[in-house]
């Protein structure tokens, strides 16, 4: 932890689907928080000097062979500890209590009753609704602990050893279904851990600028600038830190949205006075993608070719030591960690060659998407960039399903431009987290101008979300959808049908490929 962060809450990851929510909630309070593997040693944690430690939930039983554990010496560090669900069970197991399989598993909402006035429940109602998700439970709390809350199926729903600042809850306060979950976490963060809540994006900028300067020194940094939110924020942040030591390369791979290439050069080269080199690599990418229809293969080809183009261009430059990337927290999570399966290979995470000549700088890799937008606003980046639609590294290459052609790319490009224009016309940009068009590899029969047609179908995908980890399909008004559909079939050649995707994530991902 950098010395510019004077307080931090450390969350140890035991594999719960809600882990990232804990970190997010705490940051929303104005307190810096990081999620780290459960394998951190007590000595490593001591060096990080957190104000508090949270043991997350997880799918294991403390008695399972190979179940996730932590260094039990963390209970000797004189640092407040909060165990959530599996974290409470692990605390109980280490400190001499007893955990058993529940006779009745408990998933969903439950009513709990608070005993006395424990610190975690200060100023909260005696009876409240919480979210349970457990198969084991604490049947005997460790010596010296008090039982702070009970429920019908979980007699020890919360426990504490106040003199040591050890707390455990069997439910999930980080989930919004827990009625006073945020208040409970605030009581731990501010009441127990004595944090002051002064962390902000302004602090983050100062912290990251110091880290960038300390890391880079007087050396040169190269940044792949796409014009998307992530790479734009990275470029402006690093430029603010080291000025002309940053060179940006903008690769136009022919897979961009309408008007994007021109917009990138105008905004960053002219508006921010940054050194931006534009590379026209359209033919190179499309030739590599000929005959390829598998989505993972397309992602890998685009990712690898991007690096090869980048290498070719960087070879023309002298003295470049660092490569900056806009990798986010969600990229790392979805690309697979010790406790998470790989969902997709991310362009920023999975496509780097082993012999890459640069060292990486990833200043956004602890931030979620909404935090990156807040950071961009704090840096003075225009709203049309900060609130630009999330755009994958492979670009329109994964919004054309199956094999890519220039004709198909133009269909997606034009239909997407219409969608974005109408969403803006109706003032819905801030209400919908992401929206785009996709071209499935199918044709259908239609009738246009009294003639039979056999043309492409365009799919519209629009979702609401906070960070992209989960999402719901956006309830766009029917009249807006009708206007979009009418314009697409009339203005985009070779399209005779428009459909709307009403699938949430999960089970679907946001992108179709």
From Swiss-Prot:
Residues annotated as the enzyme's active site: 85, 172, 174
GO molecular function: ATP binding; GMP synthase activity
Chain residues that bind ATP: 226-232
Pathway recorded for this protein: Purine metabolism; GMP biosynthesis; GMP from XMP (L-Gln route): step 1/1
The UniProt record lists the keyword Ligase: yes
Domain GMPS ATP-PPase positions: 199-388
Quaternary structure, from the entry: Homodimer.
Entry protein name: GMP synthase [glutamine-hydrolyzing]
Organism: Bacillus pumilus (strain SAFR-032)
């Amino acid at each position: 932890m950098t010395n510019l962060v004077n307080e931090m809450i450390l969350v140890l990851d035991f594999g719960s689907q809600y882990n990232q929510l804990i970190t997010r909630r705490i940051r929303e309070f104005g307190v810096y928080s990081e999620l780290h593997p459960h394998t951190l040693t007590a000595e490593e944690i001591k060096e990080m000097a957190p104000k508090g430690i949270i043991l997350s939930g997880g799918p294991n039983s403390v008695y399972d062979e190979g179940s996730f554990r932590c260094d039990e010496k963390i209970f000797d560090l004189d640092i407040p500890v909060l165990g959530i669900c599996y974290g409470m069970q692990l605390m109980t197991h280490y400190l001499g209590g007893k955990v058993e399989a529940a006779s009745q598993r408990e998933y969903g909402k439950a009513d709990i009753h608070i005993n006395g006035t424990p610190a975690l429940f200060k100023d909260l109602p005696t009876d409240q609704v919480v979210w349970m998700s457990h198969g084991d439970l604490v049947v005997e709390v460790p010596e010296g602990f008090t039982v702070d809350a009970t429920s019908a199926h979980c007699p020890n729903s919360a426990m504490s050893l106040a003199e040591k600042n050890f707390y455990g809850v069997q439910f999930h306060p980080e989930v919004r279904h827990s009625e006073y979950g945020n208040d409970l976490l605030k009581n731990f963060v501010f009441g127990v851990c004595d944090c002051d809540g002064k962390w902000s994006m302004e602090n983050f900028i100062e912290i990251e600028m110091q880290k960038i300067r300390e890391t880079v020194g007087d050396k040169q940094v190269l940044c792949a600038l796409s014009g998307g939110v992530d790479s734009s924020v990275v470029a402006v942040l690093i430029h603010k830190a080291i000025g002309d030591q940053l060179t940006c390369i903008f690769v136009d791979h022919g897979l961009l949205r309408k008007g994007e290439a021109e917009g990138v050069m105008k905004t960053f080269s002219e508006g921010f006075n940054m050194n931006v080199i534009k590379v026209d690599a359209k033919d190179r990418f499309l030739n590599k993608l000929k005959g390829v229809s598998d989505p993972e293969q397309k992602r890998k080809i685009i990712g690898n070719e991007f690096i090869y183009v980048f290498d070719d261009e960087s070879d023309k430059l002298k003295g470049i030591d660092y490569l900056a990337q806009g990798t986010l927290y969600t990229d790392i999570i979805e690309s697979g960690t010790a406790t998470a399966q790989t969902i997709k290979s991310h362009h920023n995470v999975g496509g780097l060659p082993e012999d890459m000549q640069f060292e990486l700088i990833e200043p956004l890799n602890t931030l979620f998407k909404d935090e990156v937008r807040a950071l961009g606003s704090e840096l003075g980046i225009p709203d049309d960039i900060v609130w630009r639609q999330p755009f994958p590294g492979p670009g329109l290459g994964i919004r054309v399903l199956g094999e890519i052609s220039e004709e198909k790319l133009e269909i997606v490009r034009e239909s997407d431009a219409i969608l974005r224009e109408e969403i803006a016309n109706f003032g819905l940009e801030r209400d919908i987290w992401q929206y785009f068009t996709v071209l499935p590899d199918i044709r259908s029969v239609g009738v246009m101008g009294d003639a039979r047609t056999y043309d492409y179908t365009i799919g519209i995908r629009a979702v609401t979300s906070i960070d992209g980890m989960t999402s719901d399909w956006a309830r766009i008004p029917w009249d807006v959808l009708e206007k979009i559909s009418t314009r697409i079939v009339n203005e985009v050649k070779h399209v005779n049908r428009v459909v709307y995707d009403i699938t949430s994530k999960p089970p679907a991902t946001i992108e179709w490929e």
